[in-house]
Regions:
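N-terminal auxiliary segments of SAM/dcSAM-dependent transferases
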Residues: 2-84
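Short, glycine- and charge-enriched coil/turn segments that flank and shape catalytic ligand pockets
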Residues: 60-65, 117-122, 143-144, 180-186, ...
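A secondary-structure boundary/capping signal
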Residues: 55, 97-98, 194, 251
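An acidic site on a long C-lobe helix of protein kinase domains
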Residues: 63, 103-106, 229
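Short, basic/glycine-rich phosphate-binding loops at helix/coil junctions
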Residues: 46-47, 91, 211-216
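Alpha-helical elements of Rossmann-like donor-binding domains used by nucleotide-donor carbohydrate transfer enzymes
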Residues: 18, 38, 66-69, 109, ...
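SAM-dependent Rossmann-like transferase core, predominantly class I methyltransferases
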Residues: 54, 68-142, 147-159, 285
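S-adenosylmethionine
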Residues: 145, 150-288
Length: 288
């Protein structure tokens, strides 16, 4: 029987104490505090300032049970983003679930890099859109641009469409598998992709919660060629980009120089590699 089963009401302060005690063997104090404030704001409408101002606020039995169910999910290493079912980046809320990858900080950095460089409206293609994060951010912050977004999965594309609709952002979605021989029927000024780039042999080094809960198809590369997505995207972009068009890619730190070589072989120019906030070479851009 849970320690919360017999409790009808409790204060926020006591709830926080029980929350912390339930998770201290799994996470640091700072991580636990972050998780607690995310949950009470999302489910109870109580933010950190509210907590500080009124720690003796009474929580109902219903909400105690709700938070307890989330504690159990956290103990099983379920990512908090999947627990609450959404993330927010650059003032855009995105629905996320087990079918789409949880956006990483370096992907937001990639978007910021593109926005900084792209000063005028253009025609954009996001290959492997997932939740639609890159497509929606670029559409919102590069004013007047036309954005297309592809993914091979109808299930994933449905989530991206929901995110676009919820945020009132117009994106042209299409089911396309870039690993197939895709014909060039349209031209773009800018193509961007954050494709799968982790080799399955590296799975043992990946965080348990990622391996257990996030979609492997968005992370790991099937087969023996861990650069296959880059090869296909670069080959397609070579023909699909307008003159002086730009390709942006997020990359594995250990394979970014291989990607650079593929770009050179395909006659891309002005190749630039960018580090993320941690000093890791994670992004690359090139012009055709």
């Amino acid at each position: 029987m849970s320690c919360l089963d017999e409790i009808k009401t409790m204060t926020l302060k006591l709830l926080k104490k029980i929350f912390s005690n339930s998770l201290n063997e799994y996470y640091s104090k700072e991580e636990i505090n972050t998780l607690f404030y995310i949950l009470i704001e999302f489910y109870l409408g109580i933010n950190k300032i509210n907590y500080i101002q009124d720690p003796l606020y009474i929580i109902s039995k219903k909400n105690i049970s709700l938070i307890e169910s989330k504690i159990k999910m956290i103990q099983k290493k379920t990512p908090i983003q999947y627990i609450i079912g959404e993330v927010e980046h650059k003032n855009i809320k995105f629905k996320v679930n087990k079918y789409v990858l949880i956006p990483r900080p370096e992907t937001i950095e990639l978007c910021d890099w593109i926005i900084f460089n792209q000063k005028k409206k253009c025609k954009i293609l996001d290959i492997g859109t997932g939740s639609g994060l890159i497509a929606l951010i670029l559409k919102k912050y590069i004013t007047g641009s036309i954005v297309h977004a592809w993914d091979k999965s109808p299930v994933i594309l449905k989530i991206a469409k929901e995110n676009a609709l919820k945020n009132n952002i117009e994106i042209n979605f299409k089911i396309v598998d870039i690993l197939k021989n895709v014909k060039v029927n349209d031209k773009f000024d800018l193509i961007v992709s954050n494709p799968p780039y982790v080799d399955k042999s590296e799975m043992q080094f990946i965080d348990e919660s990622i391996v257990k809960y996030e979609p492997h198809s968005a992370i790991f590369v099937e087969g023996n060629d861990n650069l296959i997505f880059y090869k296909k995207i670069i080959q397609y972009s070579k023909d699909a980009l307008n003159s002086n068009g730009t390709l942006y890619l997020e990359c594995h730190i250990d394979r970014i120089n291989f990607v650079k070589n593929i770009l050179k072989i395909n006659n891309f120019k002005n190749i630039k590699i960018k580090e993320d906030l941690f000093g890791r070479k994670r992004m690359i851009k090139a012009c055709i």
